[in-house]
Amino acid sequence: MALSSTEVNRIRNFCIIAHIDHGKSTLADRLLEITHTLDRTQMASAQVLDDMDLERERGITIKSHAIQMKYRASDGLEYTLNLIDTPGHVDFSYEVSRSLAACEGALLIVDATQGVEAQTIANLYLALDAGLDIIPVINKIDLPSSDVEGVARQVMDLIGIKREEILQVSAKAGIGVPELIEAIVQRIPAPADNNHLPLRALIFDSVFDSYRGAVIYLRIVEGSLKKGDRVKFFASNKIFFAEEIGTMSMKRQPKSLLESGDVGYLICSIKDVKDAKVGDTVTLADNPAHERLSGYKEVKPMVFSGLYPINSNEFEDLRESLEKLALNDASLLYTPETSVALGFGFRCGFLGLLHMEIIQERLEREYGVNIITTVPNVEYRVVMTNGEVVIVDNPSKMPDTGRINLVEEPYVTMQIITLADYIGNIMKLGMERRGEYKNTDYLDTTRVIMHFEFPLAEIVFDFHDRLKSISKGYASMDYEYIGYRDSDLVKLDVLLNGETVDALSIVVHRSKAYDWGKKLCLKLKGIIPKQMYEVAIQAAIGSKVISRETISAMRKNVLAKCYGGDISRKRKLLEKQKEGKKRMKQVGRVEVPQEAFLALLNIDE
């Protein structure tokens, strides 16, 4: 049975955009409660939509979710509200943009105690680009430290709206939430009625079910989808059979038909989530649409790191764990690699730093694999003297200096929101990290947005931690990739007794190479245990050594048994010891402890 245009008019598709910790998931809980989708007794835990422990602990949303609520409005009619919960972090901005494309409106949540933050602005711009109607909401108004009017002025300046259009709520206490639901019905437009057109549905997320394969979340933009239809995916051109379709409340609810405006799920025995890419378009194989919905792009990893099991026997466990994680996360790439120092492991590609941390934490937590991580690095584009272009994502694979014409590295544009008091500290940090300052805009009398351009390699390390510490926790940042630029980059190798340790190689800017080499040698000197012979730690660019530290040998007192006697006897014993140490040095290998690899991650401490 087809939906009448009247029923389409009673659908509202919306999402919630907010900075981390501004109360997005708590507000979603209140909406579920007021619409009786869940009652309080079923809410065993707060943040119902954040179903990973990691999501709850960090207070972030990692995966997109969709949930359908029924609500009887003040006009007496029943409305279908589809809430599409989006990740808030910059690493997942493409997923956010696809989730926004599945909506007609967005709730912009701003914390009354914190004000507008960097990710609020970044996601707001994505929502405005998608043409969404925005309902601004100030949350946490019941806290003693809230500054509702000050934050309202920031929001008015940001999106140019009247004060009375901004709603005030306390998601935790439930204050103002009924008025917010009425505003969703009144102010967010209904989807267009496009049932007569060929099917085009937008995939905004997918999860993997061990028994059913990939479960695809989609928004029907045009046409309709019936159970049993043959469906085609534009990106892979593959055809599948729609075994089950339906809508998402707290659990999957099978239906026989989804129509334009609906948000639901599709199960069609897809064994690999890479066949159901976020942003792709689904159409009917028998009556296909001519072109896909706009906005699709292949997600490319930006940050790379080597993951190695601490115990080499766990290599297969690590492989299985990565395979399972990749089933749910199409943006995680991994390829096997070997290192002389660390043995067998994987070179993994991530969307950004948070993505990398989450994957590492899930490997240790959910799969019990203990891993060593090499220094995160970015993908360099190397133009050789013969004109060939080589992509390098592992510093140890960097070609010899003599064969390189130029090296290009990825750059990002960054917005930092902070209190005006910390501008000087942030400018200093920007200069340290080769940042290019652009300009500063004032949000109000105390808060500013600073605009920079940075090499991505300079911020993948500990930039966020440093930013938080120099601004006493007040600064927030957001960045966006802008392209490659050529830079004077060199490969810095670490040698122990003349042997290169491949896992300690890094690519740095020439201006920083000496400083980095010196710090690294000193750090390793304190970590590598003394041997029976002298150990030379050297940092080198090509064949040129730029820094050196020496670990002196452990010395046994061979003269202890000579209480007096002839000096030549003592000399003979010392010469014999010297010869033995020389021989040891030739055959001995310096064992590099695991702490040495971790030392690279906190070189400045």
Swiss-Prot record:
Q: Name one GO cellular component term.
A: plasma membrane
Q: Which domain of life is it from?
A: Bacteria
- Keywords of this protein's UniProt record, alphabetized? Cell inner membrane, Cell membrane, GTP-binding, Hydrolase, Membrane, Nucleotide-binding, Protein biosynthesis
Annotated GO molecular function terms are:
GTP binding; GTPase activity; ribosome binding; translation elongation factor activity
Name the InterPro entries for this protein.
EF-4, EFG_III/V, EFG_V-like, EFTu-like_2, LepA_C_sf, LepA_CTD, LepA_IV, P-loop_NTPase
Residues that hold GTP according to the record: 21-26, 139-142
Membrane topology per the record? Peripheral membrane protein
Q: Which Pfam family, an example, fits this chain?
A: GTP_EFTU_D2
Q: Does the keyword section mention Transit peptide?
A: no
Give compartment(s). Answer: Cell inner membrane
Q: What is its main location?
A: membrane
Provide the reaction this enzyme catalyses.
GTP + H2O = GDP + phosphate + H(+)
GO biological process per UniProt: positive regulation of translation
**Domain tr-type G, chain residue ranges per copy:** 9-192
Enzyme Commission number, as recorded: 3.6.5.n1
Family in the record: Belongs to the TRAFAC class translation factor GTPase superfamily. Classic translation factor GTPase family. LepA subfamily.
Q: What does this protein do?
A: Required for accurate and efficient protein synthesis under certain stress conditions. May act as a fidelity factor of the translation reaction, by catalyzing a one-codon backward translocation of tRNAs on improperly translocated ribosomes. Back-translocation proceeds from a post-translocation (POST) complex to a pre-translocation (PRE) complex, thus giving elongation factor G a second chance to translocate the tRNAs correctly. Binds to ribosomes in a GTP-dependent manner.
The protein depicted here goes by the name Elongation factor 4
* Originating organism: Pelodictyon phaeoclathratiforme (strain DSM 5477 / BU-1)
The beginning of the lineage is:
Bacteria, Pseudomonadati, Chlorobiota, Chlorobiia, Chlorobiales
